[in-house]
Curated annotation (Swiss-Prot):
Entry GO terms, CC: HslUV protease complex
Membrane-crossing segments per the record: none
UniProt gene name: hslU
Protein name: ATP-dependent protease ATPase subunit HslU
Keyword Cytoplasm: yes
Any GO molecular function: ATP hydrolysis activity
Chain residues that bind ATP: 21, 63-68, 269, 335, 407
Pfam families: AAA, AAA_2
NCBIfam families: hslU, PRK05201.1
SUPFAM superfamilies: P-loop containing nucleoside triphosphate hydrolases
Primary localization: cytoplasm
Tree of life domain: Bacteria
Length: 457
């Protein structure tokens, strides 16, 4: 289903509710931010350029839905979306990735997105062209009496009568799969022989490395070779080749750059890891502040150089998130705080939320396991009491060890179904019911022993 970016906030909220339990405040904020992007596009030109997106900072412990909200939002908006960890960046001048690299990566994703859309649009034409090329190989236009060409035709076929009607008959045979066992010889492009180039050094070198690699690829022309393969394989190869020919890369690049600038979304995870704790200004704190100062112009609005052209970041939406266990949002430099005007606090998840997470979303964990085991002919069913027991144990383990939110459910459910998953393919009974007692039998010892649960759950 194609989702339009002109969804109303209520419609966006309803879509997010299908996959994410709770966190109404965070979902409202991103729904409004998405609608504001559409509103900006309707504003007349002079004022439109002045309207900047209202960046969001989401505060909450791990496993409460911060990343999932941003990811689902991007799919709803059909926007280029990239998730990066702020802690992976280093200050300009140090070894590591600089902050501009996330914009370059965003452009690459946008190009891939637009190119895939264009390929879907021209897929029918590319397949028709590939069919024509296959038929030309099976039905040469002029009679050739060499052994190789005779082998390609059925014994009863008359090569000299290969007119349009014969070609159409063969086309139908090709589509019906009657020629699947035939072999044809096609010209395929060999993989590039250009040497791999790696530039080691300070940050900002990744774009230079990419440019050097492209230059080497152009210096070494692509080689082709004759390859013998069956008709279906040849059809796949030729369809891809025809798609590459038909895709207008100039249009793709232009549209990708436009989408990056106008509707790109950058999710900055672990923003709290680059916050200076308590205003300290020495040692690693200096480097953290340096990363913040490098982030500032990008979030503020800057022009980033990429190998496809210049990209303005003025209208890219930035969504930052962090647990802020040690540092606080106020520990970020004031200028960066000002660039994230919307702050949303996500609530910790308890037993009730865990029960809902296991049952309500369309991609709920229990539904995933039911579908997986159905492939082995096993009908899996969870009793309500079993769901409650799983949620209770997940909460207990979170409280006694590390708090990892809903991610704990993956570990607990996997442990509960460990024996069944191993024996499913050899089971004689087709139905399996997970009861509360079964959950306790599988987990009681581990959940009670804190040392064990620390390592297993």
């Amino acid at each position: 289903m194609t989702i339009s970016s002109s969804l109303t906030p209520k419609e966006t909220l309803a879509e997010l509710d299908r996959y994410i339990v709770g966190q109404a405040a965070a979902k409202r904020s991103v729904a409004i931010a998405l609608r504001n992007r559409w509103r900006r596009q309707q504003v007349p030109s002079p004022l439109r350029e002045e309207i900047a997106p209202k960046n969001i900072i989401m505060i909450g412990p791990t496993g409460v839905g911060k990343t999932e909200i941003a990811r689902r939002l991007a799919s709803l908006a059909q926007s280029p979306f990239i998730k990066v960890e702020a802690s992976k960046f280093t200050e300009v001048g140090y070894v590591g990735r600089d902050v501009e690299s996330m914009i370059r990566d965003l452009v690459e994703l946008a190009i891939s997105m637009v190119k895939d859309e264009e390929k879907k649009r021209i897929e029918g034409l590319a397949e028709a062209n590939a069919e024509d090329r296959i038929l030309d190989l099976l039905l040469p236009p002029t009679p050739v009496h060499s052994e190789s060409s005779v082998d390609l035709l059925p014994a009863s076929a008359d090569v000299s009568a290969a007119g349009s009607s014969t070609k159409e008959k063969f086309r139908q045979m090709l589509r019906d799969g009657k020629l699947d066992e035939r072999e044809v010889e096609v010209e395929v492009t060999e993989t590039s022989q250009a040497p791999m180039v790696e530039v080691m050094g300070v940050s900002g070198m990744d774009d230079m490395q990419s440019n050097i690699q492209d230059a080497f690829s152009r210096m070494f022309p692509k080689k082709t070779k004759q390859s013998k393969m069956k008709v279906p394989d040849a059809l796949d190869v030729l369809t891809k080749e025809e798609m590459e020919k038909l895709v207008d890369m100039e249009m793709v690049l232009k549209e990708a750059l436009r989408r990056t600038e106008q509707s790109g979304i950058v999710f900055l995870d672990e923003i709290d890891k680059v916050a200076s704790k308590g205003g300290s200004s020495h040692g690693p704190e200096v480097s953290r502040e340096g990363v913040q100062r490098d982030l500032l112009p990008i979030v503020e609005g800057a022009t980033v150089s990429t190998k496809y052209g210049m990209v303005k970041t003025d209208h890219i939406l930035f969504i930052a998130s962090g647990a802020f266990h040690v540092a606080k949002p106020s520990d970020l430099i004031p200028e960066l705080q000002g660039r994230f005007p919307i702050r949303v606090e996500l609530e910790s998840l308890g037993k009730d939320e865990f029960v809902r997470i296991l049952t309500e979303p369309e991609n709920a964990l229990t539904k995933q396991y039911i579908a997986l085991l159905a492939t082995e002919g096993v009908t899996l069913r969870f009793e309500d009491e079993a769901i409650e027991e799983i949620a209770t144990i997940a909460v207990q383990v979170n409280e006694s060890t590390e708090e990892i939110g809903a991610r704990r459910l993956h570990t607990v459910v996997e442990r509960v179904l460990d024996v069944l998953s191993f024996d499913a393919c050899e089971r004689e009974e087709s139905e399996f019911v997970v009861t509360a007692q079964y959950v306790r039998d599988q987990l009681s010892e581990i959940a009670e022993d804190q040392d064990l649960s620390r390592y297993i759950l």
